[in-house]
Amino acid sequence: MKLLHPAFQSCLLLTLLGLWRTTPEAHASSPGAPAISAASFLQDLIHRYGEGDSLTLQQLKALLNHLDVGVGRGNVTQHVQGHRNLSTCFSSGDLFAAHNFSEQSRIGSSELQEFCPTILQQLDSRACTSENQENEENEQTEEGWPSAVEVWGYGLLCVTVISLCSLLGASVVPFMKKTFYKRLLLYFIALAIGTLYSNALFQLIPEAFGFNPLEDYYVSKSAVVFGGFYLFFFTEKILKILLKQKNEHHHGHSHYASETLPSKKDQEEGVMEKLQNGDLDHMIPQHCNSELDGKAPVVDEKVIVGSLSVQDLQASQSACYWLKGVRYSDIGTLAWMITLSDGLHNFIDGLAIGASFTVSVFQGISTSVAILCEEFPHELGDFVILLNAGMSIQQALFFNFLSACCCYLGLAFGILAGSHFSANWIFALAGGMFLYISLADMFPEMNEVCQEDERKGSILIPFVIQNLGLLTGFTIMVVLTMYSGQIQIG
């Protein structure tokens, strides 16, 4: 007798085995198979959450909390009227009252069976989904909130460090004509642009919309926004460099230099206009006029606001003028305008710092870093403008520091507003302000500082310094935003 093929034997054996396992007798004879009934599910719940054969009210509440049911804050007497508003998320007390449960009640199988449709309806309506998310966000926010001591302590410390920048102006006066000073100032201006712009993109504006960098994943999109800005900046600078070299090769001179240098006639007309308006008397003392021969362009209004040209004007004046006491009536109007505008600017800075610290210590320090990078070059420029407007060194230091102290007032308002109201509105205001300061105020100032080097033919070094400052500020803000959850302070 021939044996069957091994492969056919295996298939036949598997078929017989499958038929045997699917017969009802096999299931009935299986000793480990428990009998499943409707009551088994209720008994399992009572066994896991209760004691014996019943549940206490607290144990039933634990079951509801596990299912995210009964977490509302409503009143059943107000909502349950003729089957309306059943989509409301009820509290556990409301649900217990609807079934006449008291504190001493014991919930057995029959009571739990009657209570199950209530649980099923609340789960199906998803009424408590938004309530649970809000409760989780509130718990996370309350855990992350800094204490009052941390808010005021870190806030006062950061504002003090920022305000001390206003006293650094006098220390740099001897170095204003040095090449390294101008390039260092250029780096700080570019750094301020990078930090302010990136702080608005990565922290202030997203915080105003309620975004979380660890949950909403907006950092990459904000980086693309900065990339678009940087791409056009880089392309424009490269094109200017190439066109300048081409023009120098063909014509032997730069068209940019001819545009930035006014003619002698224009310079003289600018001086006469200032003399007629009476502004030049405040900007340049009579005994120093003889020292400014050939430097008439510095009195142009656009150049007076710029940091570099104002420093050239100040360096050309005699040091004895700075040390003289000046009557307040002899101080130019420009000095008071600068002091008032700088005070308002510092107040808004303090407002942003205070509101940031009420959210988290890390957010406050990030905002303070951006403001510090912006304040350093601005305070140096403001100090020189005050000197040129007729103030002595002592007066310039005093009023510059006085305007810087407005940051303390803004800090107090920011902390109080952020503690009692939503800080998102303050973040929105500060974000818009940071964008304006970085792009409309400091960016033209950075280009103006580069003009002298461009006229001399040294274009590459200022371009590299600008890129280093912008990318450094961008990197600082990206790192602070990405690792805000991992870095612990205090």
From Swiss-Prot:
UniProt entry keywords in alphabetical sequence: Cell membrane, Endosome, Glycoprotein, Ion transport, Lysosome, Membrane, Signal, Transmembrane, Transmembrane helix, Transport, Ubl conjugation, Zinc, Zinc transport
BP GO terms, sorted: cellular response to glucose stimulus; cellular response to insulin stimulus; chondrocyte differentiation; gluconeogenesis; inorganic cation transmembrane transport; insulin receptor signaling pathway; intracellular zinc ion homeostasis; manganese ion homeostasis
Example GO molecular function: zinc ion transmembrane transporter activity
Disulfide-linked positions: none
Membrane topology: Multi-pass membrane protein
Spans through the membrane: 156-176, 185-205, 223-243, 396-416, 423-443, 459-479
Keyword Endoplasmic reticulum: no
Subcellular locations according to the entry: Cell membrane; Apical cell membrane; Basolateral cell membrane; Early endosome membrane
Short motif XEXPHE-motif, span: 374-379
Signal peptide: 1-28
Residue ranges, Extracellular side: 29-155, 206-222, 417-422, 480-490
Alphabetical list of InterPro entries matching this protein: ZIP, ZIP_Transporter
Motif (HHHGHXHX-motif): 249-256
PTM statement from Swiss-Prot or TrEMBL: Ubiquitinated. Ubiquitination occurs upon iron depletion. The ubiquitinated form undergoes proteasomal degradation. N-glycosylated. N-glycosylation at Asn-100 is required for iron-regulated extraction of the transporter from membranes and subsequent proteasomal degradation.
Record's catalysed reaction(s): Zn(2+)(out) + 2 hydrogencarbonate(out) = Zn(2+)(in) + 2 hydrogencarbonate(in); Mn(2+)(out) + 2 hydrogencarbonate(out) = Mn(2+)(in) + 2 hydrogencarbonate(in); Fe(2+)(out) + 2 hydrogencarbonate(out) = Fe(2+)(in) + 2 hydrogencarbonate(in); Cd(2+)(out) + 2 hydrogencarbonate(out) = Cd(2+)(in) + 2 hydrogencarbonate(in)
Entry GO terms, CC: apical plasma membrane; basolateral plasma membrane; early endosome membrane; late endosome membrane; lysosomal membrane; plasma membrane
UniProt cross-references to Pfam families, sorted A to Z: Zip
All ranges on the Cytoplasmic side of the membrane: 177-184, 244-395, 444-458
Subunit structure: Homotrimer.
Annotated function: Electroneutral transporter of the plasma membrane mediating the cellular uptake of the divalent metal cations zinc, manganese and iron that are important for tissue homeostasis, metabolism, development and immunity. Functions as an energy-dependent symporter, transporting through the membranes an electroneutral complex composed of a divalent metal cation and two bicarbonate anions. Beside these endogenous cellular substrates, can also import cadmium a non-essential metal which is cytotoxic and carcinogenic.
Family: Belongs to the ZIP transporter (TC 2.A.5) family.
Protein name as catalogued: Metal cation symporter ZIP14
Organism listed in the record: Pongo abelii
Name of the coding gene: SLC39A14
